[in-house]
Regions:
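Hydrophobic membrane-insertion alpha-helices, especially the h-region
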Residues: 6-25
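Alpha-helical transmembrane signal-anchor/signal-peptide segments
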Residues: 22-50
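Repeated scaffold domains used in trafficking and secretory/extracellular systems
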Residues: 36-42, 72-112, 116-117, 124-143, ...
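Short extracytoplasmic
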Residues: 42-71
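Short beta-strand motif characteristic of blades in beta-propeller domains
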Residues: 50-51, 145-149, 201-207, 247-260, ...
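Structural motif
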Residues: 151-166, 209-215, 255-268, 299-319
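Beta-propeller fold detector
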Residues: 164-177, 222-230, 262-263, 268-278, ...
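Extended, hydrophilic extramembrane loops/domains of integral membrane proteins
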Residues: 205, 294-341
């Protein structure tokens, strides 16, 4: 009898826990509305952030000060966003803010970048691909081997034979240690694809928190300490090969910093974006840059913060905040499900 009561208690407990997960999950799928926001873009003509929302048949757009403009002025007030249309119609300005407008420069100076929290919490590859940075025929090609970071060395493995290339591994390990790299590496970030304009290798965070650049030039190791860790504690890095080679990628710091790792006459420099404190575990980041200005959007479950930045200094010129609208799930879950189980993070999906 006691055994039956024990089993019955376990079944009730299991059913209760299961209902705390299944029922809320089904209700959330049926009622949850994903938070969507209008497109934000800094206008080089208005010198202000513009709110562009043509959803639902809306034919107007406005700026951050509340001024509303007709749809017919959309292209002319945002010439750097709609340059193709204006050039096709022959009405693109020759200069904006004293800067000559040339199609090639517009393309080269364009920056498009997006980061999501899932990028950081997703399983990271344990092996990397180091391309030749100065290929003889100009095109990036697969090197035929992969590397992995060990406790006290870097190891290159031949892709065909699955054997370790002892000479190459020793050559790169000795050079890394010579330049001050402390094993084991905490993390390493790169862009292992041939579909990129050029090769800058990998950026590796060593055991002391120093960020190093590692690449292969003429089949020889190139290792250099960026020293950006002297000014910012590196929490995460994302490679982003800019067309104009201005920066190597985006750096997220341990104290909420977000900015770019910039090329600086053969050295490196961290340029912080003048935005609110950024948490890569919770916040999304989108950057739309042109020849004069950057529009930076930071989004989380609380809302959207948008910034217009000077391209050269990344200093703030304008800012705007939009609160997240509560959907049906947000309104009902507070009282319908005061507590429930979830096996995924709302920020990352993992």
């Amino acid at each position: 009898m006691k055994c039956k009561n024990y089993i019955f208690t376990l079944l009730v407990a299991f059913a209760t826990l299961l209902s705390w997960w299944v029922v809320p999950s089904l209700v959330k799928k049926a009622t949850d509305d994903s938070h969507s926001y209008p497109l934000m873009y800094y206008s080089s003509m208005l010198k202000e952030l513009c709110i562009i929302d043509f959803r639902g048949g809306n034919e107007t757009f406005s700026d951050a000060k509340g001024n509303v403009y007709p749809r017919s002025e959309y292209d002319s007030l945002l010439p750097l966003l709609n340059s193709r249309v204006l050039m096709m119609n022959g009405v693109m300005p020759d200069t904006i803010d004293g800067c000559a407008i040339e199609p090639k420069q517009l393309r080269v100076k364009q920056v498009s970048f997006r980061y999501r929290p899932s990028d950081m919490v997703a399983p990271q590859p344990q092996m990397g691909v180091l391309f030749e940075a100065m290929p003889k025929r100009g095109n990036l090609t697969m090197p035929g081997d992969f590397f992995r970071m060990e406790d006290d060395c870097i190891t290159f493995v031949d892709a065909k034979t699955n054997t370790v290339d002892e000479k190459k591994s020793d050559r790169f390990t000795r050079e890394m240690k010579k330049k001050g790299f402390a094993f084991p590496a905490r993390a390493f970030w790169g862009n292992p694809t041939t579909r990129k304009p050029y090769e800058e290798g990998y950026f590796c965070l060593d055991a002391n928190g120093q960020l190093f650049q590692l690449k292969m030039v003429n089949d020889r190791p190139f290792v250099k300490n960026t020293h950006v860790s002297d000014s910012v504690g590196v929490k995460w890095f994302v490679m982003n090969e800019a067309m104009d080679k201005r920066h190597y990628g985006f750096v997220f710091g341990t104290k909420g910093e977000a900015g770019i790792l910039e090329e600086n006459d053969g050295d490196y420099r961290f340029v912080k974006m003048d935005i609110r404190s950024f948490n890569p575990a919770e916040d999304e980041l989108m950057v739309l840059g042109n020849i004069l200005y950057w529009t930076v959007n930071v989004q989380n479950e609380k809302g959207l913060d948008s910034y217009g930045l000077n391209r050269e200094t990344l200093e703030r010129l304008s800012s705007y905040h939009i609160d997240a609208k509560k959907g049906l799930w947000d309104k009902t879950s507070e009282w319908l499900f005061p507590c429930y189980l979830s096996f995924t993070s709302p920020q990352s999906g993992y």
